[in-house]
Amino acid sequence: MHGLAKAPKRLQAEALFTAAMADAAENLYLNEQCIPVYRGEFWTAKQRQAASIHEVSYRACFKPQLPAYFISRLSAPGDTVYDPFSGRGTTAIEAALHGRRIIANDINPLSAILTQPRLAPPAPAAIAARLAAIDLDVQSTVAIDLSMFFHADTLREIAALRHYLHTRHVDGDEDAIDRWIRMVATNRLTGHSKGFFSVYTLPPNQATSAQRQIKINQQRAQTPDYRDTRALIVRKSHQLQRDLDADQSKALQTAAARARFLTRMADDTREIADQAIQLTVTSPPFLDIVQYANDNWLRCWFNSLDAEAIAAGITMSRTLQDWNQSMARVFAELYRVTRINGWVAFEVGEIRKGKIRLEEHVVPLGTSAGFACEAILINEQRFTKTANIWGVGNNAAGTNSNRIVVFRKT
């Protein structure tokens, strides 16, 4: 039995979450618990422009302002911040920029490939020099047909770069510059502008199949044109680093030396010690909305990874009961690794057209694991174009929301 009722703002929540910014405070009555709910625009692009180093395309990721909000309020410099579903590494990168230690976990190895190099950005001149030294004219075998995406000369360069990076990695010679080039190339494989290696296709966070691309080419009467892979990698490298100042670069380098990247199920992170984490900021997979293998098959090919094997290990619960059971195990593990008075900010959403509000399921999962649920924050922002992230629709016409359940270990 649950419901919402107007209630006075609680002083503790005001102190922690600057509730003066909220339009209203409510109570959610859920399983005999009274949870304060705060709605408002808690962070905006104007309040804090996200650093350019975040600009890596990845399906289903929150904006950097979300982890920044909690990192700045619920942790201090030197504390460890964690994300068990790291994705493109938004929490890890933002925590590093704030001077925190970081641990990032994701069962998908592409997560570390896209995140770790951005903690140690090489100088653009060094990137250009390394690319110039790689022989991209060498013929390398490509076992799958990618002619619907790439011009033959572009594909030759991609295959040669893939072979070079794979050899460097296997031989143990891969360095920070190689890892950076791998990260940028992975991000530039396919997209909908001249900044990508491919002919026009879906945005890079929505990879399409070879069969679907053939239809796109037919519909647009297009054929793949040549793209200079070296030039595009250098260009994107400049874009990623364009607004990094000396303090931010130092913060990233400091975090890089101590950063830990895990590739495990989120409910079994045995490498993390008990009570090691001050703050977790994360957003788990939501039921069956995002199909990782379909989205990442080409990125996996470029990085010599088995997309189907990776997908088999990713939580894609098709029923709410299965999802609850999976998240219950995750919360038990989060309770183990969280220090006393540490925090978890767990971002969920309204899914299936608002028929399921996952926060109402997450609250009892967290409290059953031992956490105290301190509040639910619903960040509401106006937008001017259609938004649909994670399959999460708009809570009302003209607004988009993040729904974050905030727990504390007492």
Residue ranges and their predicted role:
Residues 63-66, 157, 161, 323-330, ...:
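Alpha-helical packing segments of well-folded alpha/beta enzyme cores
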Residues 64-67, 79-98, 102-109, 115, ...:
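Conserved proline-anchored active-site loop of SAM-dependent methyltransferases
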Residues 354-363, 367, 371-410:
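Class I S-adenosyl-L-methionine
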Residues 109-170, 305-313:
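Conserved phosphoryl-transfer catalytic core
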Residues 285-330, 341:
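Mobile active-site "lid"/loop adjacent to the S-adenosyl-L-methionine
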Residues 1-77:
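S-adenosyl-L-methionine
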Residues 167-279, 287-288:
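SAM-dependent nucleic-acid methyltransferase catalytic core
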Residues 313-376:
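Conserved Class I SAM-dependent methyltransferase catalytic core
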